[in-house]
Amino acid sequence: FNGQYCCHNSYLLNDVLRGEWGFDGVVVSDFGGTHDTQEAIDNGLDMEFGTDLGSLEAFQNYRLGKPYLKLLKQNETSEKVLNEKVRRVLRMMYRTNMSEGRPWGTLASEEHAMAARKIAEEGIVLLKNNNKILPVNIGSLNRILVVGENAVKMMSRDGGSSEAKSKYEVVPLEGIRKYVADRIEVDYQPGYSSTASKSVNDSLHTEAVKAAKGADIVLYIGGMNKNLHMDCEGVDRESYNLPYEQDALIADLSVVNPSLVAVMVCGNAYAMPWHKKVPAIVQAWYGGTEAGNAIADVLFGEVNPSGKLPFSFPVKIEDNAAHAFNAYPGDGETVEYKEGIFVGYRWFEKEKIKPLFAFGHGLSYTSFDYGKITLDKKTIKSTDNITVTIPITNSGNREGAEVVQLYIMDMESSLPRPLKELKGFKKVNLAPGETVKVNFTIGKEALSFYTPERHEWVVEPGKFQILVGTASDDIRSSATFRVER
């Protein structure tokens, strides 16, 4: 950033992190992210993680190892700075590991499994559910066909530094069969393979489509994996489309069986040329050790989905700002972020580009009605808070959770600003027919923006609009207020 690596950037670490934010903890580099010993010493780096100096087994051969020691012995750097680094490391140790009351703890316990399952369940996003095909009604079916390699693929492993050595992992097919038990037949066809030749994949494709003709419902479980050029570190994706010709497979499955549910296991957005042909789409992400159980719970209605998208799904890759400006991938050394502050949904709204699925989108098996926003005041000073209240009602026939999202529009800013920005969200659980009042407190932090010339956050006087809804493209109520000088 501005000529210095971020791991030892004076402005970011000394001025902003420690100065402006008052951070007194430890700064650890990214793996191999330290490139200059003197800058690392002076600019706030405390611990170096990984290095490009020699082999990884050379314990002292780090930029904050032998080179730092040499400078200290030659009195070319201050011991005072070293002492501050040591103090911060010791402070971290006492805050975490060295408390007298620290419990022994457990690993991979039943409580951990329950927590993992709940986290996975709450993160699953129901993108589409035409004709209420979900949840699956087992009582009306005789045969379920599961298609897709990700139905049987363990995802906690691989992926570079995101790899986890888990005690176990419930894959989706296992979770589905465990839930269904012996009530109905569950068949499986891979449909494709991430390691097979094209001729083998063609055969897998044909067999899956053939099997789909005789199924009451098809649960397609595909997406991506942790292989290179997918959801893996170090290399970018080569295409916005799904790999292994999955788009063609999904389209062919939809022709022979309209009762098709696409469950996508991946950590990223992707093109969906088949989305109009598939009545239900579920974004399951990488759900961890309990992924299979969580997916089954949502598909069969034991859990009402309540996840929301943390980013927009563009229709095509060119809709993204980086590609619209032709700024990606840069010249191999430098990438210029020409979109500025207009990132994600801010870019789509500025350019009036309709995404495939918007930021914050996520459906439920029930429905929620939003009432009218009320404000505790209509005019405030820049240092005041304002309380926003909105009633939310579960108007459906089953319990569910809704993530209420609050956005703010700066209507009179002196600088270009996004149409609106997310400034708060709350998740509320509601029984059928229940109404709760959801409150938000908005203050200086939510109303301010950063001015590069003044190097500070400011709240300008003027008119602001509060917008509350169930997604960035589904605003249900709004109200305005003014900030005075």
What do the PLM-derived regions correspond to, one by one?
Residues 11:
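Catalytic core of the metallo-beta-lactamase
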Residues 23-57:
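Short acidic/histidine-rich active-site segments
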Residues 44, 57-100:
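Long, well-ordered, tryptophan-enriched scaffold segments
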Residues 102-110:
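Short glycine/proline- and acidic residue-enriched helix-loop micro-motifs
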Residues 3-8, 18-22, 28-37, 65, ...:
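C-terminal non-catalytic regions of proteins with extracellular/luminal or membrane-system context
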Residues 45-52, 56-59, 373-375, 444-450:
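Compositionally biased, low-complexity linear motifs
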